[in-house]
Design a protein with these regions (language model features):
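Active-site helix of classical SDR
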Residues: 120, 156
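Active-site loop immediately N-terminal to the catalytic Tyr-X3-Lys motif
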Residues: 98, 147-151
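Conserved glycine-rich cofactor-binding loop
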Residues: 12-13
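Residue(s) in the substrate-gating loop at a strand-loop-helix junction
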Residues: 140
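C-terminal helical subdomain
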Residues: 180, 196-231
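Conserved glycine-rich Rossmann-like NAD(P)H-binding loop of the short-chain dehydrogenase/reductase
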Residues: 28-43
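Substrate-binding pocket helix/loop in short-chain dehydrogenase/reductase
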Residues: 96-97, 101-107
Length: 259
């Protein structure tokens, strides 16, 4: 599948940045959306001459009205509809339940779930009108069960995965694909802040290759790396009391408050 027009959120760093470069190098016009305009400009300059094009789209995905305007503008520049839209922007900081602040919970759920679902739903009408297109949501292996110390993050990514599952049913026969990506640990700015072991962690380039290959094949579920996928699927199969006991044994200790 050759995508000519691609819209990616969270494109200034990590997976989003890698995806933007990969598709642009394949000849696509990539609308790279993120808050940090300077990083987007640097991304556009990194693209070699003769490849596709990266169009910087300074955007805070939390602002849903701004998202709609940005996607509509990208559609207009693409002749009516986008070929591929990837809801990649996300946030999350491991936090023990006793230290959760409702404002942080609201922010994580709004960006990871509401804003991501908005990205995809805004792009759908034009895709349906042209009879083809692909929407992709970046969920997480953390969505398979509620991970200790990650209540808001796990919930937000599980909600996105369920949203996409519903889309797949509703969009049957329209020519539109709805794909879900379940990354494990990837070396990015976000995971660099983690203070706990991250087994089977991948470089961003490795992860991007896996994602691009899966999207090209139209795989409804793209999960990686395999050892961590098998582990999380095993945990997902456990009865609730057993999982809760196992979770309590592997849970990171609650950080001590200073002072």
């Amino acid at each position: 599948v050759a995508f000519q027009s691609v819209f990616i959120t969270g494109a200034s760093s990590g997976l989003g940045r890698g995806l933007a470069l990969d598709y642009a190098r394949k000849g696509a016009t990539v609308f790279a959306a993120a808050r940090r305009a300077s990083e987007l400009e640097a991304l556009a300059k990194e693209l070699a001459a003769g490849a596709g094009r990266i169009v910087p789209v300074p955007l805070d995905v939390a602002n849903l009205d701004a998202q709609e305007k940005a996607i509509r503008a990208a559609e207009a520049q693409s002749g009516g509809a986008l070929d591929l839209v990837i809801a990649n922007a996300g946030v999350g900081t491991p936090t023990h339940a006793l230290d959760l602040d409702w404002r942080d919970v609201q922010r994580i759920l709004h960006i990871n779930t509401t804003a991501a679902c908005a990205t995809l739903s805004i792009a759908l009408p034009a895709m349906v009108a042209q009879g083809r297109g692909t929407v992709v949501g970046v969920s997480s292996l953390a969505s398979f069960r509620g991970l200790p110390g990650n209540a808001a993050y796990s919930a937000s990514k599980a909600a996105l995965a369920t949203f996409l599952e519903s889309l797949r049913i509703d969009l049957r026969g329209t020519g539109i694909q709805a794909l879900t990506i379940y990354p494990g640990f990837v070396r990015t700015e976000m995971t660099a802040k983690n203070k706990f072991p991250m087994p089977f962690i991948l470089d961003a380039d490795q992860a991007v290759r896996t994602m691009v290959r899966g999207i090209a094949r139209g795989k409804r579920s793209i999960a990686y790396p395999l050892p961590l996928v098998l582990g999380t699927r095993f945990l997902a199969s456990l009865p609730a009391p057993v999982y809760e006991f196992v979770g309590s044994q592997i849970a990171p200790k609650r950080p001590r408050k200073k002072g």
